[in-house]
Amino acid sequence: MLGRDILLMMKIVLISTYELGRQPFGVVSPAAWLRKAGHDVACLDLTRQSLDEEAVRAAELFAIYLPMHTATRLAAKLIPTLREMNDGAHLCCYGLYAPMNAGYLRGLGVGTILGGEFEAELVKFAQRLQGLKPLYSGGEMSDLKVRSTKRNGVEAQAKLDGASAAPGAAAVDVGDALAQVEIGNAGAQVEKEISLDRLAFLLPDRAGMPAIEKYAHLIVPGGGYRVVGSTEASRGCKHLCRHCPIVPVYDGVFRIVARDVVIADVRQQVAAGARHISFGDPDFFNGIRHALELIAEFHREFPDVTYDVTIKIEHLRKYEKELVALRETGCLFVISAVESVDDEILARLDKGHTRADFVHVARKFRELDMTLHPTFVAFTPWTTLEGYLDLLRVIVAEDLVENVAPVQLGIRLLIPEGSRLLELEEMCGLVGKFDAELLVYPWRNVDARVDRVSEAVQAIAADADQEKQSRSGAFARIWEAAHEAAGVAAPELQLGAGYAVPFLSEPWYCCAEPTRAQLVSIGAFAKKAEIAVRLERAGTADGFV
């Protein structure tokens, strides 16, 4: 006798291809939702582990997390591999860049696109795909039959006794009995492609992920390091910066993760060895009261754990009086997307701050003995050589050389599908036709020397990283290269006393085209995928490494 309902549970593989050196919140959060719904979920972070071929071949649903441009480019190289290994599973892409590139992704065979607040929609989709309804209540095992919902007009039915396994079939284990139901095509998407619903977030389920010590770590003055955890206290953003990839999806909306959930997530990571937490919020001060209450509770429970946050220059000025609260609760540094020191470029980007605002904030941080990590989109269609030299001079004048990762000085503006930059009339003459493979509107500076400087700076940054050169040493090389390109003698570099600052071992990127190093990694990723398929066909595959 069987005294309970039988549900068909999905075998789901959640995949991350790139997330700034962090354990991806966009994987561990939906993992909690899907597991709570009863599904069998495997989580793969391909920046830190091999492709689990057993999980891939057994999967009925692949869901690939696309939080940014580089992750999307890598996913595009991965999808053919997944298809080769398991062409019966349904393919879903979710995250910020999924709806922005929906047409391209569907052309690769992706059946479902989810963006914004995606957890609930992903669960709904898994339930629809599997026809998750009670199929049996009581009675004799010999009477049991499996009934599926209609999918694409085909009703699948299988009898438990003697049913055989087939590719793309879902199985229910009831004692020794297996019921097979062909998944097939899920049909037209009915789930919201972009959901901005207010969700009651669950505690992220980090089971099965690589250990946090395998991710980016904190480099502290003196050469030491700390294990870093990461979480999110909010998603989306209430601002509408023209170049920001959040805007086409969230359109000025942001959503809060409940404080108790955030603290519980920090708690489980501290228990796993984290001594520093990196908050991945697009802007930690979007909800200022939420932020202040959170850091106060954070510090009460974890007085020896430090953290970092990302906050707009505009908010650092508006809430200047709250900076002390950050310092007193263990904030080691604040990342801020300065982007440019040219007010005309800042106006085009609709950043909400000026050059003077940035300088004011930099000096305020120094006054408070706090650390600011400014990031830049140093190269845009409007960048001039003199403008670039001006940026370098400001960094020197404000004693920020040690605060700026060299790679930040070579970043090029990313113009993806849906970018608000395309609203500017002048863009018609500045960008080329959308490149569906590169996922950008390509552009070149009218002064070819500027593009050459960008390439040179990226090469210097990559070399400096490889050789473990100091930031000041790399900056000196960039200083010389930029002046040489401009055809002027480089003034003697007068660096201030400077001081060593804490920073994460993997640089922070946003609104940027992939760097040279990232493009190399994308090519290597594709090559590994191709080799994995060839080995698997030959019966000798041993993982995606």
Feature roles, as predicted:
Residues 2-15, 35-36, 40-43, 55-61, ...:
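Radical SAM enzyme core and accessory elements
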Residues 4-263, 267, 271:
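Acidic, low-complexity intrinsically disordered segments
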Residues 14, 64, 93, 279-281, ...:
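Conserved beta-strand positions
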Residues 17, 46, 96, 282, ...:
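Cofactor-binding loop segments of dinucleotide-utilizing enzymes, especially the Rossmann-like FAD-
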Residues 26-27, 55, 74-78, 258, ...:
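Residues at alpha-helix caps and immediate loop-helix transition turns in enzyme cores, especially N-
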Residues 60, 111, 275, 332, ...:
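Short acidic/polar active-site loop segments enriched in Thr and Asp
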Residues 210-371:
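Radical SAM [4Fe-4S] cluster-binding motif and immediate context
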Residues 288, 299-480:
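A structural motif corresponding to the C-terminal lobe/cap of the Radical SAM core domain
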